[in-house]
UniProtKB/Swiss-Prot annotation:
GO CC annotations, alphabetized: extracellular matrix; extracellular space
Cross-referenced InterPro entries: Adhesion/Biosynth-related (IPR050904), EMI_domain (IPR011489), FAS1_dom_sf (IPR036378), FAS1_domain (IPR000782), TGFBI/POSTN (IPR016666)
Motif segment (Cell attachment site): 642-644
Domain FAS1 residues, every copy: 103-236, 240-371, 375-498, 502-632
Signal peptide bounds: 1-23
Assembly information from the UniProt record: Binds to type I, II, and IV collagens.
The record's account of how the chain is modified after translation: Gamma-carboxyglutamated; gamma-carboxyglutamate residues are formed by vitamin K dependent carboxylation; these residues may be required for binding to calcium. According to a report, does not contain any vitamin K-dependent gamma-carboxyglutamate residues. The EMI domain contains 2 expected intradomain disulfide bridges (Cys-49-Cys85 and Cys-84-Cys-97) and one unusual interdomain disulfide bridge to the second FAS1 domain (Cys-74-Cys-339). This arrangement violates the predicted disulfide bridge pattern of an EMI domain.
Protein name as annotated: Transforming growth factor-beta-induced protein ig-h3
Any one GO molecular function term: cell adhesion molecule binding
Gene3D superfamilies: FAS1 domain (2.30.180.10)
Modification sites for S-cysteinyl cysteine: 65
């Protein structure tokens, strides 16, 4: 094993080549992708790189690890081919690309990289070819032949009609008066071109894509005797206007222009920086309901959030997006920016109508839908995009809609739609009060909630917060999705209807005929005061059916010894509040008797000591009650205390309760949880 540990690093170093055995500067993302392509191509010989080509196009990419295994770029299938890595060439009869390309001057190197059209236009000028062939050190970002061919006819005509001014200036804009390799091309930097010292914008993305004024580098670092050539996929042009100036020029941004002016963001958009503006057109604003749009435009904070949600923190050129990316806006929302073929998508929608409009301080993509952040929405608007539509309909039917559309600071606890699969409660005064208890009197964020915290509701109740290892619950209901924080209200999506506590544990047990025998046993064991006082208890409450299932002799023996009865009853009471949503695969809950109860939950079935819980989460002010149809016994190896005081009275009380149970159990009918809740509210 020790020998293997020494050999593995050596084997890896030999596989990666000499560069891997020496510490040096960190490789750029482009160089790392190129290295991966070289590793994938090495089976075909030295200096062979694997290249992925989009099927049906001429677009090629050096392959990174993710693209290699997925065989997709922008959701489209690719084919793998193998070609010489930059700077190498084939030798007849030899495997791979063993020979280093001979160096020539810049002009000749243009032909080597496949930019013969650039050579042709260079020949048409009087001054440029001698510079490219003469002494000096230059960098040329050379458009590919396809890039020149894709220029609009009127643009190309204007260039070639005046070759010694327009064409010469255009070519000089693609040049820098020093050698610049890809490891020097830093994200967000500007290079000074040889045309009037105009800036060229460089972006070097983590996925290895490098862009020059949003044109992608196709073949990089081709050395020449007097410089270096990088092949790019577009003809680039000078950039003179900032983002704000472009907004002022474009007629399609009339509404955006007014909104920016009202928000004061024009200072940001005309200042220094590198941003991406997802610029909504006039039509995008017109798609929004007038009431919503007027509300946002009239609210300075909501308006600023709206506009900031259209600004990314860095310049993102379209060519840099080859798969889905999560990008944060200035507002703080994360947008999913992706691509499908040649189309860019925002949150999965192809809403970008024009891309890569360059500005001196970033790039603009035109969009035809407005991106309204949660922070600019009402609770109603938040709920419309969430899985809580049934609950929101209940609030509206109960006449509580104004709370969800106004400027009241609230947190809405909205049960998800699946809670109501068996139907919804009838709207009456009690239901309305129940719904009011799903509204907290403050705008909260779940990340600030803590165990034992109490929350005041519009219905006048105090709700408790329970924090468990894998869940966060408010009374019996647990948060089922991330918060949605709106302009004034926050939406919590809950996994069930919330049950406010209606009394102590003893009040709950006394108010339910199913527990008459248990109540009698508690009274005879002297535990009434315990379950009435302030505390945090979880009670696994045996029903009358559970007691009646005990053999008569065992039942009489149990009831004939008050101390043993108290010991067993204490074993049914945990010393903390554990609602069903807080139960994981297994929770060991310490009982008041001293031993631990094993509580688990699987597929919505809660068990205690492997016995099923018939009904969970009956909330009390000092705990929670879970109904069980069995009597639990402490572990047999723990000696039970014995005694016979109060035995006669205990047995008598129990007999009376048993008789009462037989008389009433036929009339007890299990109802849906929310109906039972409404019944408890009568007491």
């Amino acid at each position: 094993m020790a020998l293997l540990g020494r050999l593995l690093p050596l084997a890896l170093a030999l596989a990666l080549g000499p560069a891997a055995t020496h510490a040096g500067p960190a490789k750029s993302p482009y160089q790392l992708v190129l290295q991966h392509s070289r590793l994938r191509g090495r089976q075909h010989g030295p200096n062979v790189c694997a290249v992925q080509k989009l099927i049906g196009t001429n677009k090629k990419y050096f392959t990174n690890c993710k693209q290699w295994y997925q065989r997709k770029i922008c959701g489209k299938s690719t084919v793998i081919s193998y070609e010489c890595c930059p700077g190498y060439e084939k030798v007849p009869g030899e495997k791979g690309c063993p020979a280093v390309l001979p160096l020539s001057n810049l002009y000749e190197t243009l032909g080597v990289v496949g930019s013969t059209t650039t050579q042709l236009y260079t020949d048409r000028t009087e001054k440029l070819r001698p510079e490219m062939e003469g002494p000096g050190s230059f960098t040329i970002f050379a458009p590919s032949n396809e890039a020149w061919a894709s220029l609009p006819a009127e643009v190309l005509d204007s260039l070639v009609s005046n070759v010694n001014i327009e064409l010469l200036n255009a070519l000089r804009y693609h040049m820098v008066d020093r050698r610049v390799l890809t490891d020097e091309l830093k994200h967000g930097m500007a290079l000074t071109s040889m045309y009037q010292n105009s800036n060229i914008q460089i972006h070097h993305y983590p996925n290895g894509i490098v862009t020059v004024n949003c044109a992608r580098l196709l073949k990089a670092d081709h050395h020449a005797t007097n410089g270096v050539v990088h092949l790019i996929d577009k003809v680039i042009s000078t950039v003179t206007n900032n983002i704000q100036q472009i907004i002022e020029i474009e007629d399609t941004f009339e509404t955006l222009r007014a909104a920016v002016a009202a928000s004061g963001l024009n200072t940001l958009l005309e200042g220094d920086g590198q941003y991406t503006l997802l610029a909504p057109s006039n039509e995008a604003f017109e798609k929004i309901p007038a009431e919503t749009l007027n509300r946002i435009l009239g609210d300075p904070e909501a308006l600023r959030d709206l506009l900031n949600n259209h600004i990314l923190k860095s310049a993102m050129c379209a060519e840099a997006i080859v798969a889905g990316l999560s990008l944060e806006t200035l507002e703080g929302t994360t947008l999913e920016v992706g691509c499908s073929g040649d189309m860019l998508t925002i949150n999965g929608k192809p809403i970008i109508s024009n891309k890569d409009v360059l500005a001196t301080n970033g790039v603009i993509h035109f969009i035809d839908e407005l991106l309204i952040p949660d922070s600019a929405k009402t609770l109603f608007e938040l709920a419309a995009e969430s899985d809580v539509s049934t609950a929101v309909d209940l609030f509206r039917q109960a006449g509580l809609g104004s709370h969800l559309s106004g400027n009241e600071r609230l947190t809405l606890l909205a049960p998800m739609n699946s809670v109501f699969k068996d139907g919804t409660p009838r709207i009456d005064a009690r239901t309305k009060n129940l719904l009011l208890n799903h509204m907290i009197k403050d705008q909260l964020a779940s990340k600030y909630l803590y165990h034992g915290q109490t929350l005041d509701t519009l219905g006048g109740k105090k709700l408790r917060v329970f924090v468990y290892r894998n869940s966060l619950c408010i009374e019996n209901s647990c948060i089922a999705a991330h918060d949605k924080r709106g302009r004034y209200g926050t939406l919590f999506t809950m996994d069930r209807m919330l049950t406010p506590p209606m009394g102590t544990v003893m009040d709950v047990l006394k108010g339910d005929n199913r527990f008459s025998m248990l109540v009698a046993a508690i009274q005879s064991a002297g535990l009434t005061e315990t379950l009435n006082r302030e505390g945090v208890y979880t009670v696994f409450a045996p029903t009358n059916e559970a007691f009646q299932a005990l053999p008569l002799g065992e039942r009489n023996k149990l009831l004939g010894n008050a101390k043993e009865l108290a010991n067993i009853l204490k074993y049914h009471v945990g010393d903390e509040i554990l609602v069903s949503g807080g139960i994981g695969a297994l929770v060991r809950l310490k009982s008041l008797q001293g031993d631990k109860l094993e509580v688990s939950s699987k597929n919505s079935l809660v068990t205690v000591n492997k016995e099923p819980v018939a009904e969970a989460d009956i909330m009390a002010t000092n705990g929670v009650v879970h109904t069980i149809n069995t009597v639990l016994r402490p572990p047999a190896n723990k000696p039970q205390e014995r005694g016979d005081e109060l035995a006669d009275s205990a047995l008598e009380i129990f007999k009376q309760a048993s008789a009462f149970s037989r008389a009433t159990q036929s009339s007890v009918k299990l109802a849906p949880v929310y109906q039972r809740l409404l019944e408890r509210m009568k007491h």
